[in-house]
Amino acid sequence: MSSAHQDHPPLTVLIPTLNEEENIRECLESVKWADEILVVDSGSTDRTCEIAAEYTSRILAHEYVNSAAQKNWAIPQAAHPWVLIVDSDERVTPELRDEIIALLRKGPNCAGYHIRRVNHFMGQPVRHVWKNDKCLRLFLRDKGRYQDRQVHADIDLKGPAGWLKHPLLHYTCRSFEKYLLKHDRYTTWAARDRAKRTPKVRWHHLTVRPAFRFFKQYVLKRGFLDGRAGLIICGLSAFSVFMKYAKLWELQQRKDLDKPH
């Protein structure tokens, strides 16, 4: 997809997908101004790829291992030097679009840029619990690579990083069923990451840490000001900490059982 703006370095928007037919059209509409849209799909069985084909001819299939590995494989496939990574449940606002185009026209003085995210939970904006959510998503193709982690990996950037003013919209949960399935996957990956740093799960991992997560988000980050949505988010977040360590305990038990006696 060619942009109407040709007086700036060309940009590839990279979108990883898996069964995102409910989200993908709105996402693609928000980035159709880009010089290239690159969709990297990990085996969708719904209409995701069919819808994506209306916006781009570059739809690549790649087996999914984890988010970081998928994106690290996809980044070098971009045709242009600047890459913007957008998830299917995110939207680039017109203001953010114009800011990115203006930045590329002017000539970026950084190798990458952080973007704030405004998160929505069940359609409701969350202004406190996730207030300081940010991610490095706009960067030079040859300067950025995700850390080798199963989940919540950051980009290791070779060069200075700047900030963009306008946020990315993130619609993180449209149904509890999908949200819980997502958290089930994430806590499994997080347990595998934690296994490298936590040799043994102890009682405080299963009690104190989930409780502190709830206190931190609901009280210190003023999640109570987000109403019922804030309470639910903080409760689910605390539960995800519990599940991460419970799954790590399970992994450690299996290793103990596999040891020769």
Describe each model-derived feature in a short phrase:
Residues 8, 33, 78-81:
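Active-site acidic short loop of glycosyltransferases
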Residues 10-12:
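Cell-envelope/extracellular polymer assembly enzymes that use nucleotide-activated donors
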Residues 14-33:
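Short, well-formed alpha-helical segments that are part of the catalytic scaffolds
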Residues 22-25, 46-55, 95-96:
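Acidic helix N-cap motif at the loop->helix transition within catalytic regions
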Residues 30, 41-50, 87:
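A conserved acidic beta->alpha catalytic loop
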Residues 33, 54-55, 134, 157:
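Short, structured coil segments at secondary-structure junctions
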Residues 49-79:
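Conserved donor nucleotide-binding strand/loop of the catalytic core
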Residues 69-75, 81-82, 86, 93-255, ...:
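Catalytic-site signature of metal-activated, phosphate-bearing donor transferases
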